[in-house]
Amino acid sequence: MQNFDKTAVIDAANALPGRLTPMPVATLHVVNGHSMTHVPEGMEVAIFAMGCFWGVERLFWQQPGVYSTAAGYSGGYTPNPTYHEVCSGRTAHAEVVRVVFDPAIISYKQLLQIFWENHDPAQGMRQGGDVGTQYRSAIYVLTPEQETQAQESQALFQQAMTKAGDSRAITSEIAAALPFYYAEDDHQQYLYKNPQGYCGLGGIGVCMPPNL
């Protein structure tokens, strides 16, 4: 047990069992007052992992056309995990942000550009000083169209990195979305509630080519 590697994704057989009861979630987003759970007609959902979800959630709630955001966990096996369990590396979940957006105002392609340009997608199971599988970079897609656009955007950003002299390979996971589990209320809109709180978010200085 002492030799457990938090940078290796655990398999389902060894993941924590979790629980049947969902995490209680606030009714309204504290920044904009919108519903934390409802997706209004005509709006769409995106799920991104870019390291610690505190800064990621703030990045997206600041975007015009984003209706609501929520910090949570996805990509793993443990149902309804706690933050402590996710940090143990024994759930296989990543820290993610669920973004509800109006595609008439901000497109999924624009959200992808924000994703690629605002973190380091070539660090594997870490993001800066935050180390562990929960900090991996990932795009969890909900439709075939999202998958196609995510794959195309990754190829373009890889080209942009190479052109900028960064020879590393992108390690971001692109996969079909598994169940999204809300994080504890303390983590929702964390940097609004704690303006001086930790934010490890930062890009690598590479811009997405304009033909995304």
Curated annotation (Swiss-Prot):
Its EC number is 1.8.4.11. GO terms for cellular component: cytoplasm. Transmembrane segments: none annotated. One of its GO terms (molecular function) is L-methionine-(S)-S-oxide reductase activity. It comes from Yersinia enterocolitica serotype O:8 / biotype 1B (strain NCTC 13174 / 8081). The lineage of its organism: Bacteria, Pseudomonadati, Pseudomonadota, Gammaproteobacteria, Enterobacterales. It catalyses: L-methionyl-[protein] + [thioredoxin]-disulfide + H2O = L-methionyl-(S)-S-oxide-[protein] + [thioredoxin]-dithiol; [thioredoxin]-disulfide + L-methionine + H2O = L-methionine (S)-S-oxide + [thioredoxin]-dithiol. The keyword Electron transport does not apply. The keyword Aminoacyl-tRNA synthetase does not apply. Keywords: Oxidoreductase. It is an enzyme of class 1 (oxidoreductase). Belongs to the MsrA Met sulfoxide reductase family. One of its GO terms (biological process) is protein modification process. Coiled coil: none annotated. HAMAP family: MsrA (MF_01401). This is Peptide methionine sulfoxide reductase MsrA. The active site is at C52. InterPro entries: Met_Sox_Rdtase_MsrA_dom (IPR002569), Met_Sox_Rdtase_MsrA_sf (IPR036509), MsrA_MetSO_reductase (IPR050162). SUPFAM superfamilies: Peptide methionine sulfoxide reductase (SSF55068). Has an important function as a repair enzyme for proteins that have been inactivated by oxidation. Catalyzes the reversible oxidation-reduction of methionine sulfoxide in proteins to methionine. NCBIfam families: msrA (TIGR00401).
